[in-house]
Amino acid sequence: ILVDTNIIIDALANREPYADDAKRIMEKCAAREITGILAAHSIPNLFYILRKNFSQEERRFLLKNLCEIFQISDLNEKKIVAALENNAFSDFEDGLQEECAVEAMADYIVTRNPADFKHSRVKVILPDELLRELEKN
């Protein structure tokens, strides 16, 4: 499951009303109940975005832990060019997320912004929907 950057922000920055579901997803990844994937470019984005919530030292610690919890889908020329050529995504970063999900053979992209991924080749799911789906299995 490729986890969109906004889910990680929700969990780490404790953004309500989204934090609980985001934390549960991260816990399932940490417990290896599901395979969580982060796109490599999410790491520097998180480092920058979380500067309002955490010191540099805290961010380094948190992001290092994320690298232990999640598989990191690397960013390479092939993915960058494919995302640039994919006009289905108006947001280049979302196109990169989708390319990482495709190459990692992810079953889902979990995000709070499914409209951003309406043309995704990978099924897109909201956090609460993912948690309900996991409870069924």
Where are these regions (language model features)?
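Acidic, PIN/NYN-like endoribonuclease modules and their adjacent C-terminal/linker elements
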Residues: 102-137
